[in-house]
């Protein structure tokens, strides 16, 4: 796969992905074959892991996912070979993550979502009963990304990445926006609105599923994803506003607004919970 272009008397093919030096190739034109091999390239290590979410030093024992962010697009199909979770003794936690064939990358191939096996999180499910939870409260773990994890150009990372975190008790409580606290701006200014959550939230979802009714601006997270910072593009007026929260918003354990992640999977569901929006009013003076 790639694109073609005419450069004078030459026909130039630009491959979508870099051709490894050890792969034999051939060009076919006018019924003739022209074998060739890509020239060996100097391996330049410039790509690194830039961030891991959640960024807090402590996570719940029923943590649902990690987000790994890289500084450049990455080659797919390496995650389960190059990423591992170690316990406090330095031993690999076997099958901690849900090792699916289709890795969960964003469109730029720079952010990878690692899901913990839900079967080891939900109570009353066979994997948890037989194997146990991947994370144990009170223990420390290390997330390791091998240096040999290749970027889209085939180059390894600048260095191995390690992130140590401690595990606290499981979180089975739903997200409750009505319990959040507001640090309000002054009318006539563009001071940021700060909203302190009652717990850290899913970083990717929080920046997409929270907004201010009728307002535009920039939204970011602070304090290890436990605080929302909204800076408006226009001055605040002296009136009531509404913080809009999509009920698909999740905390670190996958609990949603008004709905815990750990529902009873064996009881028949008689009430359907529709996705909606919770509006939390606040007044600027």
Residue ranges and their predicted role:
Residues 1-285:
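Acidic, low-complexity Ser/Thr/Gly/Pro-rich repeat segments typical of extracellular/periplasmic
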